Amino acid sequence: MAKIKSQRQLVSMTKDSSPRQPASEPHSSDSDSSDEESDHLDAVSSRKKRKLSVDFSQEEGDDEDDNQDESDDDDDVDEDGGKMKQPVAKPTFAFNAPSRIKRHPAKGDSERIGKGQPVTDAEMEDAVQSVAQAAGKKRILAPTDQNTTFESLGVEPWLVQSLANLAVKRPTGIQKGCIGEILKGRDCIGGSRTGSGKTIAFAVPILQKYAQDPSAIFAVVLTATRELALQIYEQFKAVSSPHVLKAALIIGGSDMRSQAIALAQRPSIVIATPGRLADHIRSSGEDTICGLRRVKFLVLDEADRLLSSKGPGSMLPHIDECMAVLPPPEDRQTLLFTATVTPEVRALKEMPTRPGKEPVHVCEVDTQVLAIPDSLKQSYIQLTVTHREHFLHEFLLTAANTERSIIIFVNRTSTAQFLHHLLRLLDHRVTSLHSKLRQQQRIDNLGRFRASAARILVATDVASRGLDIPEVSVVVNYDLPRDPDDYIHRVGRTARAGRKGEAVNFVGQRDVELVLAIEKRVGRPMEKWEEEGVNLETRVIRDSLKLVSEKKREALLNIEENREVGGRRKRQKLKLGAE
């Protein structure tokens, strides 16, 4: 049996962008790799127990192109419909991958890199601890008194009882730090990791102030995605009970006319995505939007995404259109909340205030040292790019994962669509969530996942922010995000509110620098994924090479023929023209 090559350097610590090819296996493209596999298969028929060896350093396909932001209406680049490789039959398969990711050393060890001496895990752990301790000295922390209650923060009894009915009995750190200050009339910038209760931190004081002085369109809440807007809408309704709250949900994918009517009726709270609200400001007329000119509260939830100027999916132009009709900052309370406090968010601390108004209150709770909770286990699986789907299938079939609720994150809508088709053909209970789906289909798919009718959700970054699904046990990064902050939002879908969770990252050759950047951002190294009695490489070789390759062809054919998941052809609307 051929031995797996040992101690293979995955990627050099220099800035060379191209992978290093071994001299003995000079193939530079997927087609060359396919030819080499065919030659080996011919040799198998004549020589017994001959093993096929695939080089881990072969080029990645177009699936690893630059990531694109998931805004409401952005288009994504289609995946490369490359020529399918022939499935490898029964011969065994050797994956040449190093057992550990080579990480950068701690400060003071630069000389050791030049000598080729790796840094031990213990040294890396010490470096991470020292960085975390240094960062902790500079943060503004909310009170941590365990005896703090909502009553002591000034919350009225009816709201305290409403929260108790929702099993919310004690305020979290971000709620302790913000609710009292918002009730005093201060603008607020709140930063706290995912799952820490940021929605309640701004919903409670808004509802209390509204009950004291009700008026039309008392507050506008802007957020990054339709699903998050719907969730905030539902949470406002739940917290405001037993009182009847007149709220309007203004998001893309829904009927503009009914939304315009709802705005014209002066709801108490407007929850919206910036793009759709900007559409109404441009086209629905003054009678519809005049209520926005007297708003008392403006909330930017996921403020880092809303204020980001990166890429073609930036929402800043829509935000500017919305701000143009709202009262000036000195005449309203402005609240910004996010899990990742960016320089753009912090810059708003200098917003002008009217004379006598207190300065902006900034509360950051565990946004640097504890960007992810301690209850989240991070791990990685190193694999060959051409067999990513095979590893995913076998990972989902392991004993520990057969009953767990799992979200699989990808970078592009085309990948999400492909995996939805493929995993359904492989008999997994799966659904998907991405920007190419109709809005009602997005709501239905998310509902199926929440209700456990589907245990796997394949999603782009539209599902990475704010969604609270307590049952999610595992987050799989099928494609690693290009921005470490996006990683924090993705893995924040699990291990919420003190629960345990797991984040598993699929790492190809070119992903190692991304892993190192993520580890630096979250302050903790990832561990190699392990499960007792499970060897994914062996399972892929033994069970999945032929099966998954066949189903992959079928999935691609279904997509090409415009079939729905499950094989039915999509209905085409016929347009009848006059002859």
UniProtKB/Swiss-Prot annotation:
Biological processes annotated in GO: rRNA processing
Limits of the Helicase ATP-binding domain: 179-359
Regions of compositional bias (Acidic residues) in chain numbering: 57-79
Any GO CC annotation of this UniProt entry: nucleolus
Residue ranges, annotated region (Disordered): 1-117
Residues annotated as binding ATP: 192-199
Compositional bias segments (type: Polar residues): 7-21
EC class: hydrolase
Tagged with keyword Secreted: no
Locations listed in the record: Nucleus, Nucleolus
Protein name: ATP-dependent RNA helicase DBP8
